[in-house]
């Protein structure tokens, strides 16, 4: 069943439907869920690049006791969302890109 759930959450990202963001966040935050499923949800959030995922991704990364696949995927997704939103802001104003990554 784990493979089916991984496929389901990653497919939500590929469908590019931002209505899935709240559900993906809940899966990712669920400590009782398999870590590979949670990592799949984190990856899908990175594909969707929705700002609503930034805080939950940040919390997962900061509260991690160790850096495994879940945390690594969350960090990559966080960076993707930050980069996408930074590029969108560039058109609105001229600012220097932060160097915190």
What label would you give each PLM region?
Residues 1-15, 19, 23-24:
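Eukaryotic tandem repeat interaction scaffolds
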Residues 2-3, 18, 33-36, 51, ...:
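Alpha-helix N-cap/helix-start positions at coil->helix boundaries
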Residues 6, 18, 39-42, 51, ...:
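N-terminal cationic amphipathic segment used for targeting or macromolecule association
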Residues 7, 23, 36, 40, ...:
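Alpha-solenoid helical repeat scaffolds
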Residues 11-14, 44, 73, 77-80, ...:
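Core register positions within helices of long alpha-helical scaffolds
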Residues 13, 29, 33, 46-49, ...:
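Amphipathic alpha-helical interaction elements
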Residues 17-29, 50-62, 85-96:
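Amphipathic alpha-helical scaffolding segments comprising HEAT/armadillo-like alpha-solenoid repeats
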Residues 100-101:
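Short, solvent-exposed mixed-charge patches
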């Amino acid at each position: 069943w784990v493979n089916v759930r991984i496929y389901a959450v990653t497919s939500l990202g590929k469908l590019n439907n931002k209505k899935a963001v709240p559900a993906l966040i809940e899966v990712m935050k669920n400590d009782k869920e398999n870590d590979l499923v949670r990592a799949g949800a984190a990856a899908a959030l990175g594909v969707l690049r929705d700002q609503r995922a930034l805080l939950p991704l940040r919390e997962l990364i900061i509260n991690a006791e160790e850096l495994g696949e879940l945390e690594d995927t969350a960090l990559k997704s966080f960076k993707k969302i930050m980069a996408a939103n930074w590029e969108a802001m560039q058109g609105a104003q001229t600012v220097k890109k932060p160097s915190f990554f």
